[in-house]
From Swiss-Prot:
Family matches, as Gene3D superfamilies: Pseudouridine synthase, PUA domain
GO terms of biological process kind: mRNA pseudouridine synthesis; tRNA modification; tRNA pseudouridine synthesis
Function: Responsible for synthesis of pseudouridine from uracil-55 in the psi GC loop of transfer RNAs.
Name of the protein this chain belongs to: tRNA pseudouridine synthase B
Keyword vocabulary terms for this entry: Isomerase, tRNA processing
Catalytic residues (UniProt): 48 (nucleophile)
Entry-linked Pfam families: TruB-C_2 (PF09157), TruB_C_2 (PF16198), TruB_N (PF01509)
SUPFAM superfamilies (alphabetical): Pseudouridine synthase (SSF55120), PUA domain-like (SSF88697)
Amino acid sequence: MNTGKPQKRAVNGVLLLDKPEGLSSNTALQKARRLFHAEKAGHTGVLDPLATGLLPVCFGEATKFAQYLLDADKAYTATLKLGEASSTGDAEGEIIATARADISLAEFQTACQALTGNIRQVPPMFSALKHEGKPLYEYARKGIVIERKARYITVYAIDIAEFDAPKAVIDVRCSKGTYIRTLSEDIAKHIGTFAHLTALRRTETAGFTIAQSHTLEALANLNETERDSLLLPCDVLVSHFPQTVLNDYAVHMLHCGQRPRFEEDLPSDTPVRVYTENGRFVGLAEYQKEICRLKALRLMNTAASAA
């Protein structure tokens, strides 16, 4: 019986989505999946509902390699309001404390410099980090505070894009696991005041930029062929790894769980992108230097990679 619903299809590739404000990352993902009628989809790192910007969405076989984008460096543009602390660290919470807001540019610059480099950061309660199987934000909404350990992160740069206290806009380049809400609070703490985020936009991840992204509205106005043309190939997610070309027999060995011979001047356990002699992406294999072999890590489905 025909229900009238569009039939799901095997879509493989990466969509650079510009997530709008007010949607959770999962809601944005599901909207994109429905637009493409894709059987399978996943994203590569959560953005808060308040936040906008770059959210790479993986369809089909690309989901096998999504984890490698989670470890990537990222860039954000954050808007801060100085002098006010929020219960959530952003504009969605209630103002719970106030302090001086007449901050000078020199004070703000000094604080930004102090928070640049390899630093320790305590994750916020309003985060998706798990404690006993539940995300921290579920505890936070009940008023329960869980002790969190500080983690090492790297803030490569904090550039001040705009400053007119109590408003400040900063461009941040940082490592994975950096919470910009917490960074903003820590900048203010260094000055002796409070701050919370009023806007946050992810502008870059793993070398992809917001200029390459597409809004849900723009995607909805395209036909299927036009939308599909915007998808990036699955191997863009692992383009930072070295690559090699194998003959058909060696590729067959990988798919059969065997380990073809391979010799390269690479550290042991290095992930290697594998391609066939005609340029087809096979997947990732691990270089086992001590025995000069390649071990399959994550391989494309043969039907999908041949498409």
